[in-house]
Amino acid sequence: MDISRRAVGTAAIGTVVVTSSLAVAERANAQASTESTFDRVKQSKVLRVAALPGESPYFNKNIATSEWTGMAVEMAKNIATSFDAKVEYLESTYGNSVLDLQSGKIDLAFALNPTPQRALVIGFSRPVFMHGFGTVAKKGFEPKTWGDLNKPDIRIAVDIGSVHELAARNFASKGEIIGLKTRDECVLAVQTGRADCVILAVILGLTAVKKNPALGKYIVLRDPFVQLPNCMGVRYEVDKRWRDFLDNWADYNRGAAQIRKWMIDGLALNGVMPEDIPSQVGF
């Protein structure tokens, strides 16, 4: 079973704070340039991308050189090449990148789940990849299924308002769910013994384990196998050429296994080797 059929429709909690009404969204869009994104990138030769500090392996910033690396950075460069353009990065957050798209500050945002709440205010490309879900547990605890977590004596850390929380409440509701503000707090809760495990998507979980040797292994949970599309966010426009281009770009590079290469290379920058990636995971 896929969470995209069962649970995404109820994802009112979302993963970001978006505008409170469509009227606000419309005002933000009205302030953006009337020039289409496709024409703007083609003519200016600049692709403006939301860069997310601390969100490795999508984005890694070298403090000394201010250079950006990571899987999303390589994807952005490849997209820009099609327009003979350079990439310009605007530091942002997941939540602010939605607002930045609406106001026309950026042309593209990476690594967004297309929740119904977000889709009220921005558009999305077709999936860049499907992002599976699992858990990082304390050492000695190795659950295999959601049922292994769905017990009153299991303490499950989740970041409040995230799809991680949504999955936990749908499939492990009998567990003691501990809501915390950030993913880092959730990981710390497992390290310090406050929680038995934390729910994380594959990319985030694998990276967390490499950063924190005191944690147990990352495990993709089964029954059900939960996964969500990971997409690129764009501004809603009458001219559909930009989103059409990104759809074709995603389909082509996913089919050619180039997305997989960028993913593996980005994970390697954070110490995650191909052999660390669970066999159930496919990019």
Residue spans for each PLM region:
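N-terminal secretory signal peptides and thylakoid transit peptides that target proteins
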Residues: M1-V16, A23-N29
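Ligand-binding clefts/hinges and TM-proximal coupling segments of bilobed small-molecule sensing domains
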Residues: A32, V163-L180, K217-V220, A250-F283
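Extended ligand-binding regions for polar small-molecule ligands
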Residues: A32, V73-S82, G147, S162, ...
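Extracytoplasmic small-molecule ligand-binding "clamshell" domains
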Residues: A32-L112, L120
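Periplasmic-binding protein-like
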Residues: P53, M130-A137, V202, L206, ...
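Short helix-initiation/N-cap motifs at beta->coil->alpha
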Residues: Y89-L99, I178-L188, T192, L228
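A ligand-binding cleft/hinge motif common to bilobed small-molecule-binding domains
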Residues: G95-N96, L112-V121, A167-N170, D196-V226
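Flexible hinge/capping segments at coil-to-helix
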Residues: A137-R155
